[in-house]
């Protein structure tokens, strides 16, 4: 089985690292604060309805102003952020002295999107497709405009002014031709498209893709989405980074439609909403692993699983399940393949049954993915009475699915630990080795530097410090830790910052989700890339090489140990400077 996954992994990594998929994913992530912020006003306006309290109409309308003019313009913002992220990738292919202006690209993309999306009315304009219903069109615009700029800048199709002209003025004229070409191209396309179809592009896209929207809400569609995320992760590639860009427009549109149904007093019926992925499919992280650390904590007999359970139950509660994925491990572990794939599928099909058959309201609010799954389900469904039953039943089913497989795996590890102890005792060594037994996880780390090209060095896990703490007391060192969602990277950065403060060191660490790091990298001395983002190493190395920053990657087990041991994390940084 592992040989098959080893062959598939490079293909999945190439998909995840594709610059266009990355631009869509990172462009959406950049707009998440808008979605969460606007949802706060929406929840204040409508969550009290669950307890029979209704605001006066003027209060509700006032609260919804913030929602309507943030989420109502989401596609406009996404067009800009998607274009910006693709521009950053394109700039890596250009000389440092001849770069695309990201601000100009954002402006051109947003103008082009508005031209394609607004429907003129007799009095005013229709802004329907500036929000969630225009997301696919926004992605299209955000991916095309940077390429127009790239062709113009690369081939010097720009207006050049004398050297005596100030740089900011010269840049404005340099951007004139690519901006003019971009806006004019979309204007001509919009005019021709409307003449041919009688409607604007976003509306036409929704009409054409409506069967796909409906299919994604079916049992089969939901199972494929949930299973695909788990399958990719099992192969070692961050699943949501591949699946999410394809389904985000559907999830956001469904969430908005659900809210409209609720406001109209109708049954909230769309199953695939934003938080369905976060709280149902990924109940405690990809693979629905919320119950896994608790099973290990209370039922495991092997030292390895007991230790992982102890370290993982808090992060998993908040949807950060890397300690489980890499600590057990689940990734590439045939013993845990079936429950890891089956549990999220069972969860989402059960959710579909509760919504479609039992009449429970689906999710109409968008909460941060780090909210514990049971709490997030209750809030997102507006505290629907059946949601309480669903949460309890989901917990029971997840335990029932995972428990027998974990028990078998635990027995295997326990036997290995006992065998190891016997060997040590036979050699006359009074050392208990069970805590360090990890036959399926290699140790060591890989370091890629700006002078290293594609070569890598494998260092021992306990590499000696190159400088000692005295170095950090005399020199400022900035470290950036990157992971998929900012969860484990935050834990590691906090551990480094805490020790730095306690010992008076000039070491500063920052944490980001991958894709939110471009502006920080140039000011860093080191970037630590979490193992779940290994597929992005090639793209990231181009950026770190550009700024002469050291890029360091770790194995899964070592990364988890670093997040749980501040001294080890500090030694790790020291040994790589």
UniProtKB/Swiss-Prot annotation:
This is PTS system lactose-specific EIICB component. It catalyses: lactose(out) + N(pros)-phospho-L-histidyl-[protein] = lactose 6-phosphate(in) + L-histidyl-[protein]. Residues 4-405 form the PTS EIIC type-3 domain. The EIIC type-3 domain forms the PTS system translocation channel and contains the specific substrate-binding site. The PTS EIIB type-3 domain is phosphorylated by phospho-EIIA on a cysteinyl residue. Then, it transfers the phosphoryl group to the sugar substrate concomitantly with the sugar uptake processed by the PTS EIIC type-3 domain. Induction: By lactose. The operon consists of lacABCDFEGX. A second transcript of only lacF and lacE is also lactose-induced. Gene3D superfamilies: 3.40.50.2300. InterPro entries: LacE, PTS_EIIB-like_sf, PTS_EIIB_2/3, PTS_EIIB_3, PTS_EIIC, PTS_EIIC_3, PTS_IIB, PTS_Sugar-EIIC/EIIB. It is a multi-pass membrane protein. The phosphoenolpyruvate-dependent sugar phosphotransferase system (sugar PTS), a major carbohydrate active transport system, catalyzes the phosphorylation of incoming sugar substrates concomitantly with their translocation across the cell membrane. The enzyme II LacEF PTS system is involved in lactose transport. The chain crosses the membrane at residues 27-47, 63-83, 100-120, 133-153, 176-196, 219-239, 280-300, 326-346, 386-406. Pfam families: PTS_EIIC, PTS_IIB. One of its GO terms (cellular component) is plasma membrane. One of its GO terms (biological process) is phosphorylation. The lineage of its organism: Bacteria, Bacillati, Bacillota, Bacilli, Lactobacillales. Residues 476-577 form the PTS EIIB type-3 domain. Changing residue 483 to H/S: Unable to be phosphorylated. It comes from the Bacteria. It is found in: Cell membrane. Its EC number is 2.7.1.207. Keywords: Cell membrane, Kinase, Membrane, Phosphoprotein, Phosphotransferase system, Sugar transport, Transferase, Transmembrane, Transmembrane helix, Transport. The modification Phosphocysteine is found at residue 483. It comes from Lacticaseibacillus casei.
């Amino acid at each position: 089985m592992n040989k098959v996954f080893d062959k598939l992994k490079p293909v999945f990594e190439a998909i995840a690292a594709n610059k266009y998929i990355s631009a869509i994913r990172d462009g959406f992530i950049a707009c998440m604060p808008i979605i969460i912020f606007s949802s706060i006003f929406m929840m204040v306006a409508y969550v009290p309805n669950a307890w029979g309290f209704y605001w006066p109409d003027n209060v509700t309308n006032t609260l919804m102003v913030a929602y309507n003019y943030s989420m109502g313009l989401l596609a406009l913002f996404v067009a800009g952020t998607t274009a910006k992220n693709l521009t950053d990738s394109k700039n890596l292919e250009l000389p440092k002295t001849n770069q695309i202006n990201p601000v100009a690209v954002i402006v051109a993309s947003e103008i082009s999107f508005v031209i394609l999306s607004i429907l003129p009315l007799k009095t005013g304009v229709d802004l329907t497709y500036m929000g969630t219903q225009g997301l696919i069109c926004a992605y299209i615009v955000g991916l095309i405009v940077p390429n127009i700029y790239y062709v113009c800048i690369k081939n010097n199709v720009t207006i050049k002014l004398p050297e005596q002209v100030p740089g900011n003025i010269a840049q404005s004229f340099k951007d004139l031709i690519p901006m003019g070409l971009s806006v004019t191209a979309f204007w001509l396309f919009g005019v021709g498209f409307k003449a041919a179809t009688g409607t604007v592009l976003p509306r036409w896209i929704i009409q054409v893709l409506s069967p796909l929207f409906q299919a994604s809400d079916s049992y089969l569609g939901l199972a494929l989405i949930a299973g695909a995320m788990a399958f990719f992760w099992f192969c070692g590639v961050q699943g949501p980074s591949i699946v999410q860009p394809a389904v985000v427009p559907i999830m956001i549109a469904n969430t908005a439609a659900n809210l409209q149904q609720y406001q109209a007093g109708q049954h909230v019926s769309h199953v695939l909403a934003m938080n369905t992925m976060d709280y149902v499919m990924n109940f405690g992280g990809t693979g629905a692993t919320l119950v896994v650390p608790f099973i290990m904590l209370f039922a495991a007999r092997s030292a390895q699983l007991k230790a992982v359970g102890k370290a993982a139950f808090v992060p998993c509660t908040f949807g950060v399940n890397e300690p489980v994925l890499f600590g057990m491990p689940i990734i590439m572990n045939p013993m845990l393949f079936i429950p890891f794939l089956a549990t999220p599928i069972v969860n989402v099909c059960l959710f579909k049954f509760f919504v479609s058959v039992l009449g429970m309201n689906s999710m109409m609010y968008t909460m941060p993915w780090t909210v514990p799954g049971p709490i997030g389900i209750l809030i997102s469904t507006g505290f629907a009475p059946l949601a309480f039953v669903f949460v309890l039943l989901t917990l029971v089913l997840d335990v029932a699915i995972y428990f027998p497989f974990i028990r078998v795996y635990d027995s295997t590890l326990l036997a290995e630990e006992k065998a190891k102890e016997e060997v040590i005792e036979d050699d006359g060594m009074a050392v208990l080795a069970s805590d360090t037994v990890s036959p399926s996880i290699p140790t060591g780390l890989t370091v890629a530097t700006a002078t290293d090209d594609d070569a890598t060095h494998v260092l021992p896990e306990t590499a000696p410090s190159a400088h000692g703490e005295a170095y950090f007391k005399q020199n400022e060192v900035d470290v950036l830790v990157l992971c998929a969602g900012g969860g484990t990277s935050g834990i590691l950065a906090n551990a480094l910052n805490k020790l730095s403060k306690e010992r008076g060191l000039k070491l500063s660490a920052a944490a980001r989700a991958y894709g939110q790091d471009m502006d920080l990298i140039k000011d860093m001395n080191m970037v630590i890339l979490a193992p779940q983002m290994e597929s992005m190493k090639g793209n990231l190395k181009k950026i770190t090489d550009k700024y002469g920053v050291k890029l360091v990657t770790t194995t899964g087990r070592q990364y988890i140990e670093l997040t749980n041991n501040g001294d080890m994390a500090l030694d790790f940084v020291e040994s790589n400077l």
